[in-house]
Structure formats: C-alpha cells, structure tokens
From Swiss-Prot:
UniProt name for this protein: CASP-like protein 2D1
NCBIfam families in alphabetical order: A_tha_TIGR01569
Cytoplasmic side: 1-5, 70-81, 153-186
UniProt record similarity statement: Belongs to the Casparian strip membrane proteins (CASP) family.
Keywords for the protein's UniProt record, in alphabetical order: Cell membrane, Membrane, Transmembrane, Transmembrane helix
InterPro entries: CASP/CASPL (IPR006459), CASP_dom (IPR006702)
PANTHER family attached to this UniProt entry: CASP-LIKE PROTEIN 2C1-RELATED (PTHR33573:SF30), CASP-LIKE PROTEIN 4A4 (PTHR33573)
TM region(s), chain numbering: 6-26, 49-69, 82-102, 132-152
Annotated segments matching region Disordered: 165-186
Gene Ontology, cellular component aspect: plasma membrane
Extracellular topological domain residue ranges: 27-48, 103-131
Stretches with biased composition (Basic and acidic residues): 175-186
Natural source organism: Zea mays (Maize)
Topology class, membrane: Multi-pass membrane protein
Lineage start: Eukaryota, Viridiplantae, Streptophyta, Embryophyta, Tracheophyta
Length: 186
C-alpha cells in the first residue's frame, strides 16, 4: 500500500481526533465538585488539568485545520508533507506530556503521597475524580490517533523522498531520468 492508499485511514484518524479532543476538553473543563465539609475543587485549581484542557483545544483546532488542508488536491498538499509531519509529531508530544501531568494528578488524588503530606481526595470528591478519569481516557484515545497519524505522515514524507513526484508533464524529474540512464561500470 502506497502513501496514496493511506488517504482514507488518515482522514478517518484526523476526523476522530476532533470529537475525542473536544469531549476530553468538555469533560475536564466542566469538572467541579463542592462539598460542605471539604470545600470546592475545580479543574482550574490544578495546573496539570488546565494544561490538558489547553492541549485538547490546540490539538482539536489543528485536527480541523489539517482535515481542511488535506482536502486540497494532492500536488498542493504534497508541498506541506514535512509541515504535517512536524505538526503531527508536536501534537502527539503535547498529548503525551499533558496526559502524563493529568495522570500524575489523578494518581495523587486517588492514593495521596504520605511523604509530602498529600492526602487522597477521591473519597471526598469522587465525581470530580471520575470525570477527570473519563477525560484522561478520551485524551489517551486522541493520543493514539495522533501516534498513528505520525506514522502515516512519516511514511508519506519518506516514501516520497525515495520516489520523487512527476513533473507537470507527467514525467519523472530530469535528475531522476538522468540517473536512470546512467550506466555504472565496475
């Protein structure tokens, strides 16, 4: 299967990222719980959760932009393959770092850390922890999509480097024709 054969799965992955990122964003951004005894907790009280919301917004916006950009005809889109590869990689890395930050906060909320006198909080704010867990799971699914997209983008870039696209007249580029005609003698 060539790079052109990956067009439909690539578009499907890009389209999947949008609702996954937006659902994760919504689940976390609407996450707050109040308790008469222990007060209130909101996602914005914890920087790791705020970071997750921000990264979800950025990756959803990029996914929409990349769907629009990849809907152009291939010769125009081919010029931007390197940009798409770098942006897919950057999105995947942002998703990894924000997932890591949110997972650490959830771990502390569930189990605490006696060494630094951080008590567990999920027994008091169970709904908050549940929504944060759902948001993190949706975020991980978006991460899986971007990991696959990074592989597809890399395949496209590096397979096109080995086989240059034809000129406007449908012929291989002049340097490729010259290389094919050269005879090597040992």
């Amino acid at each position: 299967m060539g790079a052109a054969g990956l067009k439909v799965p690539e578009m499907a992955l890009r389209l999947c990222v949008v609702p996954l990122s937006l659902a994760s964003l919504w689940e976390m951004a609407s996450n707050a719980q109040a308790d008469d005894t222990y007060g209130e907790v909101k996602f914005s009280d914890l920087s790791g959760f705020s970071y997750l919301v921000g990264v979800n917004a950025v990756t959803a916006a990029y996914a929409v932009a990349s769907v629009l950009a990849s809907s152009f005809k291939r010769p125009l889109a081919a010029r931007y393959d390197w940009v798409v590869l770098v942006m897919d990689q950057a999105s995947a890395y942002l998703l990894v770092t924000s997932a890591s930050a949110a997972a650490e906060l959830l771990q502390l909320a569930r189990h605490g850390d006696r060494g630094v006198s951080w008590g567990e909080a999920c027994s008091y704010f169970g709904r908050f922890c549940g929504k944060a867990t759902v948001s993190l799971a949706l975020h991980a699914a978006a991460l899986a999509c971007f990991a696959a997209l990074s592989l597809v983008s890399a395949f496209r870039v590096f397979s096109s480097r080995c086989h240059p696209p034809p000129d406007a007249d449908g012929q291989p580029p002049k340097h490729a024709r010259d290389e094919e005609q050269r005879v090597y003698h040992y």
